[in-house]
């Protein structure tokens, strides 16, 4: 153990665009006992301009060594990496991530299974050549109802049609949404009049535009590719559906042909809904992707190439798909069920949440040549299944995760431990009844999460990296 007089030579540098945060690159000697706070004090002292008083609000900084966030003292870092205090360290400093403080909470009638958002800068808005003035939240619930909320927490519209719990919801455009559920259906919905699309006049706002049939088990996840008008669906029938957001591009199914897919029940409500559905147009998928041996949990499009998709499954695998040929072109195997999936495109990483409670990072460019893929980074912190992931809209290194442990965690891939843990603000649920099922990180709204507590919780998500 080094004493308080032990020092190490360091060089501070930053890649921050703000010139006022740049300081001299002259080397300094500092105590090896310093942690982030002490190093941050030194940088603030170096940045202090002539005439500034001690009352000037300091800027909190994080520090990286060789691209990894420093989460210990300099001394502990040296010991862990087998370095001597006679070494010289280059410390990159960057604005620290601020706590994602609680902002608001909206009530819902049942468990919230899925969330999505739309704002003026959303990809779904840009691709549609439309505009919106205010952000909105889309929710799917276990009561079978899809809802849109405004930022006052008011339900603006409800979409009723599914005969079982909703499992996934996505905005397609300001006037279209898509949902899927335990009733094995994918539904396209019309939210409002769209002058750019010629729809049948008899379809009212908030009504089903088309039912997309083909899955033989619950459909638990959806992905939308806005530029090419495509949808991927993940099913518990071990299959992935490939659809169009425009029902005219898919083959018609006559309602009588698909009566066998209506869940058998004596429920008066379900019989009534099935009768109503008999008048709604139905479509079959453009293709079905088969190859998983267990239920598919999540699916996404590649951010840079819309002809490529990725999926994760309870069969422990991540699969890469060629959507043109409907073929699986790569499979890598882990030792646990994979439950959620996210791409960090600028880092060429796939982020996978697992039943083993940890989060794995994979590079899809590295072809899997063995049955066990081991060269990946593992993030540990959750204590139950990791079922939802969402990328930070302003920082390529950051994302949020949600878990059945009742928390949302904020991560930076440059650190093995989470930066912050968000708990439920009004947690009156019994232990094990506070699962969080969905998280979305929206630049306008914040970090939005929902689950068993029937509440849409919003935490600060913008400006926390400034």
From Swiss-Prot:
Write down the PROSITE patterns for this protein, in alphabetical order: WD_REPEATS_2, WD_REPEATS_REGION
Q: Which GO terms describe its cellular component?
A: nucleoplasm; PeBoW complex; preribosome, large subunit precursor
Read off the InterPro entries from this record.
G-protein_beta_WD-40_rep (IPR020472), NLE (IPR012972), WD40/YVTN_repeat-like_dom_sf (IPR015943), WD40_repeat_dom_sf (IPR036322), WD40_rpt (IPR001680), WDR12/Ytm1 (IPR028599)
- Keywords of the record: Nucleus, Repeat, Ribosome biogenesis, rRNA processing, WD repeat
Q: Which stretches are WD repeats?
A: 120-159, 161-199, 214-253, 291-331, 333-372, 381-421, 431-466
Q: Which GO terms describe its biological process?
A: chromosome organization; maturation of 5.8S rRNA from tricistronic rRNA transcript (SSU-rRNA, 5.8S rRNA, LSU-rRNA); maturation of LSU-rRNA from tricistronic rRNA transcript (SSU-rRNA, 5.8S rRNA, LSU-rRNA); protein-RNA complex remodeling
Chief localisation class: nucleus
Indicate yes or no for the key word DNA repair: no
Which residues does the annotated region (Ubiquitin-like (UBL) domain) include?
A: 8-95
Keyword match Signal = no
Named from the GO MF annotations, one term is:
ribonucleoprotein complex binding
Where found?
Answer: Nucleus, Nucleolus; Nucleus, Nucleoplasm
Q: Which HAMAP family match?
A: WDR12 (MF_03029)
Q: How does it assemble?
A: Component of the NOP7 complex, composed of ERB1, NOP7 and YTM1. The complex is held together by ERB1, which interacts with NOP7 via its N-terminal domain and with YTM1 via a high-affinity interaction between the seven-bladed beta-propeller domains of the 2 proteins. The NOP7 complex associates with the 66S pre-ribosome. Interacts (via UBL domain) with MDN1 (via VWFA/MIDAS domain).
Give the similarity note: Belongs to the WD repeat WDR12/YTM1 family.
Q: What is this protein called?
A: Ribosome biogenesis protein YTM1
Q: Which organism is it from?
A: Debaryomyces hansenii (strain ATCC 36239 / CBS 767 / BCRC 21394 / JCM 1990 / NBRC 0083 / IGC 2968)
UniProt lists the gene as YTM1
């Amino acid at each position: 153990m080094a004493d308080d007089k032990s020092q190490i030579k360091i060089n501070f540098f930053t890649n921050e665009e703000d010139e006022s945060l740049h300081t001299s690159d002259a080397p300094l000697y500092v105590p090896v006992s310093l942690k982030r706070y002490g190093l941050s004090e030194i940088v603030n002292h170096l940045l202090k301009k002539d005439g500034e008083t001690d009352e000037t609000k300091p800027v909190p900084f994080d520090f990286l060594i060789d691209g990894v966030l420093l989460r210990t003292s300099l001394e502990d870092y040296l010991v862990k990496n087998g370095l001597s205090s006679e070494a010289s360290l280059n410390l990159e400093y960057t604005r620290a991530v601020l706590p994602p403080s609680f902002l608001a909470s909206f009530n819902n009638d049942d468990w919230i299974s899925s969330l999505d958002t739309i704002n003026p800068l959303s990809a779904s808005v840009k691709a549609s050549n439309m505009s919106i003035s205010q952000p909105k939240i889309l929710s799917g619930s276990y009561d079978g109802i899809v809802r849109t909320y405004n930022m006052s927490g008011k339900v603006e519209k409800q979409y009723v049609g599914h005969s079982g719990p909703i499992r996934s919801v996505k905005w397609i455009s300001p006037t279209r949404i898509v949902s899927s559920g335990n009733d094995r259906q994918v539904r396209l919905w019309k939210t409002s009049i769209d002058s750019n699309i010629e729809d049948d006049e008899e379809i009212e706002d908030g009504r089903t535009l088309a039912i997309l049939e083909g899955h033989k088990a619950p459909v638990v996840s959806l992905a939308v590719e806005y530029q090419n008008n495509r949808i991927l669906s993940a099913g518990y029938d071990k299959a992935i559906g490939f659809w169009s957001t425009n029902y005219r591009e898919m083959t018609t199914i006559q309602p009588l042909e698909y009566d066998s897919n209506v869940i058998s029940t004596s429920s008066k409500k379900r019989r009534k809904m099935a009768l109503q559905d008999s008048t709604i147009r139905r479509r079959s998928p453009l293709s079905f992707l088969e190859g998983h041996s267990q239920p598919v949990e999540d699916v996404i499009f590649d951010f840079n190439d819309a002809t490529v998709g990725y999926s994760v499954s309870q069969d422990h695998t991540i699969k890469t798909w060629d959507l043109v040929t409907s073929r699986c072109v790569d499979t890598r195997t882990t030792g646990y069920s994979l439950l959620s999936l996210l791409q960090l495109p600028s880092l060429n990483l796939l982020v996978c949440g697992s039943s083993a409670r940890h989060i794995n990072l994979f590079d899809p460019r590295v072809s899997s040549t063995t049955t066990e893929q081991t060269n990946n980074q593992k993030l540990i912190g959750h204590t139950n299944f990791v079922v939802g992931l969402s990328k930070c809209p302003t920082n390529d290194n950051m994302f949020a995760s949600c878990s059945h442990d009742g928390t949302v965690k904020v991560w930076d891939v440059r650190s093995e431990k989470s930066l912050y843990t968000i708990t439920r603000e009004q947690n009156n649920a019994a232990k094990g009844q506070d699962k969080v099922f969905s998280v979305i990180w929206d630049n306008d709204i914040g970090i939005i999460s929902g689950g068993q507590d029937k509440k849409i919780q919003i935490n600060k998500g913008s400006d926390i990296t400034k």
